[in-house]
């Protein structure tokens, strides 16, 4: 029944999704204002969702242009459907324009198709189809739309300061059949707190280093500028050998008398950095083989001592595992250095329940002072958990099973979704077991089958929760 209903709307679903995907809704603090709190792109995407909702007869409510909601249904209780329309930067290497969606016979290709614009449109259409059917609602529905999920969650933080908290809800921002637990998440910076004088003149001086744009992405590009006193050719040959040895891509050029080294890695979501190749850490590893100026020497040695090839907190002394939630993970998402200020590393740490977070951070903060580094702690989100046997979770899982025939059990992830804003919130799709996960990677796409199947699952789930009651 539900798949047949979705078939009637397939063309509209694709058209509305294409419109949303065409908006480059990447956070841009350089253009932030009261009207565009995290930049014009996210605001434009939020307004777009209001426009299609108003076109379809729904009420909308805006909260300071950083978040808002689409309202449907009636009743005392509220089901929250928590979505986001901001996206991570596109990065390099796409086969097409990431913000000019390509529709093939079986897929849509663009940044945000999986994370989270495709699932947002699927969930929206589930509510729209039920509303068009004029069902007898037993609950209200708030489709809550955020614009800063990929960075600091300023959107939901502001939204829930003044707006009603849903009784229960789901975020269509992960995998099916349901995600009933999420690791704790924090970001912190490891900052070089002083520069050192050189006792002897070094052969090489690291002038600058840049890699990464987001804490929650593995950097796929790194660049270093190095002043080479002599034997430039030797360094270039040594670099080429390093690239060959580690099966990496990169290049070296001379610019204004400085050697510019670039290295390419593989970007993946920071919740499992072991699946990617951190361009920044590999380039620092190479640079560590040079006779550097002292400040740079301390910077690259710190990287190798605590960060390089350590995805699970091993080198930081934070290795920890639980059977329910898995391992601590550490992603080095942003690296920068200049020869006047020194360097810094931006870390995304994810941890399971029962990990002694505060104790670990305090110990590590004290330890790294001996190497000239301070730890600056950012926002901390505690681990989130809902019993998978809760009737709410079971209704979601039943809808998934009815639509797919797959009997998989709910599980936990290292990612973080808006579901953790709610006491009774879980992540629910829209990835399937056989979906190719290119979230935060080049050539991100969603298949039409996945998009429409997710819509039918959301249809049955919302009907079960908000019409049957």
UniProtKB/Swiss-Prot annotation:
<feature type="binding site">
    <location>
        <position position="115"/>
    </location>
    <ligand>
        <name>Zn(2+) 1</name>
    </ligand>
</feature>
<keyword id="KW-0224">Dipeptidase</keyword>
<dbReference type="InterPro" id="IPR050072">
    <property type="entry name" value="Peptidase_M20A"/>
</dbReference>
<feature type="binding site">
    <location>
        <position position="173"/>
    </location>
    <ligand>
        <name>Zn(2+) 2</name>
    </ligand>
</feature>
<dbReference type="GO" id="GO:0016805">
    <property type="term" value="F:dipeptidase activity"/>
</dbReference>
<keyword id="KW-0378">Hydrolase</keyword>
<feature type="active site">
    <location>
        <position position="86"/>
    </location>
</feature>
<feature type="binding site">
    <location>
        <position position="84"/>
    </location>
    <ligand>
        <name>Zn(2+) 2</name>
    </ligand>
</feature>
<dbReference type="GO" id="GO:0006526">
    <property type="term" value="P:L-arginine biosynthetic process"/>
</dbReference>
<dbReference type="GO" id="GO:0006508">
    <property type="term" value="P:proteolysis"/>
</dbReference>
<dbReference type="InterPro" id="IPR002933">
    <property type="entry name" value="Peptidase_M20"/>
</dbReference>
<feature type="active site" description="Proton acceptor">
    <location>
        <position position="149"/>
    </location>
</feature>
<dbReference type="Pfam" id="PF01546">
    <property type="entry name" value="Peptidase_M20"/>
</dbReference>
<comment type="similarity">
    <text>Belongs to the peptidase M20A family.</text>
</comment>
<keyword id="KW-0482">Metalloprotease</keyword>
<keyword id="KW-0479">Metal-binding</keyword>
<dbReference type="InterPro" id="IPR036264">
    <property type="entry name" value="Bact_exopeptidase_dim_dom"/>
</dbReference>
<keyword id="KW-0862">Zinc</keyword>
<feature type="binding site">
    <location>
        <position position="115"/>
    </location>
    <ligand>
        <name>Zn(2+) 2</name>
    </ligand>
</feature>
<dbReference type="GO" id="GO:0008777">
    <property type="term" value="F:acetylornithine deacetylase activity"/>
</dbReference>
<dbReference type="InterPro" id="IPR010964">
    <property type="entry name" value="M20A_pepV-rel"/>
</dbReference>
<keyword id="KW-0645">Protease</keyword>
<dbReference type="GO" id="GO:0008270">
    <property type="term" value="F:zinc ion binding"/>
</dbReference>
<protein>
    <recommendedName>
        <fullName>Putative dipeptidase SH1171</fullName>
        <ecNumber>3.4.13.-</ecNumber>
    </recommendedName>
</protein>
<dbReference type="GO" id="GO:0008237">
    <property type="term" value="F:metallopeptidase activity"/>
</dbReference>
<feature type="binding site">
    <location>
        <position position="440"/>
    </location>
    <ligand>
        <name>Zn(2+) 1</name>
    </ligand>
</feature>
<feature type="binding site">
    <location>
        <position position="150"/>
    </location>
    <ligand>
        <name>Zn(2+) 1</name>
    </ligand>
</feature>
């Amino acid at each position: 029944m539900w798949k047949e209903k979705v078939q009637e709307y397939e063309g509209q679903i694709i058209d509305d999704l294409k419109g949303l995907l065409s908006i480059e809704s990447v956070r841009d603090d350089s253009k932030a204002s009261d009207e565009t709190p995290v930049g014009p792109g996210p605001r434009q995407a939020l307004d777009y969702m209001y426009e299609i909702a108003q076109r379809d007869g729904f009420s909308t409510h805006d909260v300071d242009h950083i978040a808002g909601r689409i309202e449907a249904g009636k009743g005392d209780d509220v089901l929250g459907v928590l979505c986001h329309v901001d996206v991570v930067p596109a990065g390099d290497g796409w086969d097409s324009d990431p913000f000019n969606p390509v529709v093939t016979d079986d897929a849509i290709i663009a940044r945000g198709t999986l994370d989270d614009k495709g699932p947002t449109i699927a969930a929206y259409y589930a509510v729209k189809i039920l509303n068009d059917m004029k069902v007898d609602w037993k609950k209200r529905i708030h489709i809550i739309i955020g614009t800063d999920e990929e960075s600091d969650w300023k959107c939901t933080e502001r939204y829930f300061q003044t707006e009603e908290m849903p009784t229960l809800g789901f975020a269509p921002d992960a995998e099916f059949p349901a995600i009933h637990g999420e690791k704790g998440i924090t970001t912190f910076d490891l900052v070089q707190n002083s520069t050192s004088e050189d006792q002897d003149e070094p052969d090489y001086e690291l002038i600058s280093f840049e890699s990464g744009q987001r804490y929650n992405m593995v950097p796929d590009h790194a660049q270093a500028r190095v002043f080479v006193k002599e034997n430039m050719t030797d360094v270039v040959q040594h670099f080429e050998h390093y690239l060959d040895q580690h099966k990496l891509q990169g290049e070296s050029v001379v610019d204004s008398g400085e050697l510019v080294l670039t290295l390419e890695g593989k970007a993946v979501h920071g919740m499992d950095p072991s699946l990617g190749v951190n361009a920044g850490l590999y380039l620092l590893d190479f640079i560590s083989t040079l006779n550097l100026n002292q400040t740079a020497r301390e910077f690259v040695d710190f990287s190798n001592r605590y960060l390089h090839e350590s995805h699970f907190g091993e080198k930081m002394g934070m290795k920890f595992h639980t059977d329910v939630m898995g391992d601590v993970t550490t992603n080095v998402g942003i690296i920068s250095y200049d020869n006047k200020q020194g360097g810094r590393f931006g870390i995304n740490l994810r941890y399971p329940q029962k990990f002694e977070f505060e104790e670990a951070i305090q110990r590590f903060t004290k330890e790294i002072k001996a190497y000239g580094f301070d730890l600056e702690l950012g926002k901390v989100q505690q681990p989130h958990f809902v019993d998978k046997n809760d009737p709410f979770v079971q209704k979601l899982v039943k809808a998934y099973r009815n639509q797919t025939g797959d009997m998989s059990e709910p599980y936990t992830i290292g990612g973080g979704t808006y579901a953790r804003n709610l006491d009774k919130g879980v992540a629910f799709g829209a990835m399937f077991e056989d979906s190719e996960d290119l979230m935060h990677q080049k050539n991100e796409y969603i298949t039409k089958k996945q998009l429409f199947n997710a819509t039918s699952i959301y249809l049955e789930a919302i009907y079960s929760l908000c019409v049957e009651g």
